[in-house]
Amino acid sequence: GIVDFAKKVVGGIRNALGI
């Protein structure tokens, strides 16, 4: 759903910032 997609996007952004 939209919530799962949003969580995936946020997770990707946080992972990118963590590098």
Curated annotation (Swiss-Prot):
Tissue-by-tissue expression: Expressed by the skin dorsal glands.
Predominant location category: secreted
Secreted found in the keyword field: yes
Domain of life assignment: Eukaryota
One Gene Ontology biological process: defense response to bacterium
GO cellular component, one term: extracellular region
Compartments (UniProt record): Secreted
Swiss-Prot/TrEMBL keywords: Amphibian defense peptide, Antibiotic, Antimicrobial, Secreted
Pfam families: Antimicrobial20
Role noted for this protein: Shows a medium antibacterial activity against L.mesenteriodes, M.luteus and S.uberis.
Identification of the protein by name: Uperin-2.1
Organism: Uperoleia inundata
